[in-house]
Amino acid sequence: MKPYSDNIIFYDSEFTSLDPYKGEILSIGLIKMNGEELYLELEYDGEVSDFVKDNILPYLKGKKVSREEAREKIRKFIGGKESYLVAYVDSYDSIYWNKLFKIKDSTKNNQQPAFWMTIDFASMLFGLGINPESYNYKDKDNFYKKIGVDASKYREHNALDDAKLLREVYLKFYQSISKVMPK
């Protein structure tokens, strides 16, 4: 099995709330197939959920950039060729990506630098008969062990580390697909 395209950028974001009407993106991590990466922490001084206060904010210690700066840096990082964005579960990442790029209509794609349709890795696993929850390193049927990924070297809830982990999993997954496919 071979993916449709190798023009892929793995991404993850951390945000203030699961409520897309109130939430805003706090950080984003992107990594290309070749390993080139971009990590940004965005300016924000509004309300955040208790989970974010306890699990995200204490680790956001980098220089903060404005949303406009973030859009410019992401456009420069992606370059002129539309890439496919891959997230583990893209539900929230896509919402906050669209909010960052002020996208209200996916048919008018000129506002963002990537292909409008994000790829959801959890759905790929599900479609192949693999429990998407096994991606959680705490799961007893640990997917990582099956494909030879040491998830302990990545910080949980860090946008760049989550994107790096997804890239490593994706690459190993395609190398060892016969090991992980249900019998």
What are these regions (language model features)?
Residues 2, 6-7, 21-26, 32-57, ...:
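Metal-dependent phosphoesterase core characteristic of DEDDh/y 3'-5' exonuclease domains
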